[in-house]
């Protein structure tokens, strides 16, 4: 595929009316090149973050094991109890202060292999995250594979 693209580009350059000195050499062109993404250090995830729509304030921290976890600090849900928890003993606890995501491992610029507890339905899902800017991240919660999930964009709290 790449050879065909280069051959086509070379043929077009050789038959075009553009003077030879004005045509860029093929080695300097970016035919089919994807833009480079900024990469962020592993600890860029740590800190306080607003969920999408600023519904909740979360604290992301690195654990002693080197993995990351997310703690609910505040927002619309903070005073509610964990009434949908599958463990009846946990249903009286307040949501504020609970770990809702855990086991996030930094790998190839993303945080993967994590789990997310959703207090709205009492179920646990898979989760992955990626820092997309100095003050933004994208989170994806899913079942089995990331294709079967939902994404949210979070904003760093100041």
Predicted feature locations:
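N-terminal helix-cap/turn-to-beta initiation motif at the start of protein domains
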Residues: 35-48
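Edge beta-strand at a domain terminus
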Residues: 136, 143-158
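Central antiparallel beta-sheet cores of small beta-barrel/beta-sandwich binding domains
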Residues: 46, 52-126
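A short, sequence-level motif marking secondary-structure junctions
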Residues: 63-65, 130-134, 155-157
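Bacterial N-terminal signal peptides that target proteins for export
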Residues: 1-7
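Bacterial N-terminal signal peptides
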Residues: 8-16
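Signal peptide processing junction and immediate N-terminal pro/mature segment
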Residues: 18-33
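Short, compact, well-ordered microdomains
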Residues: 126-139, 146
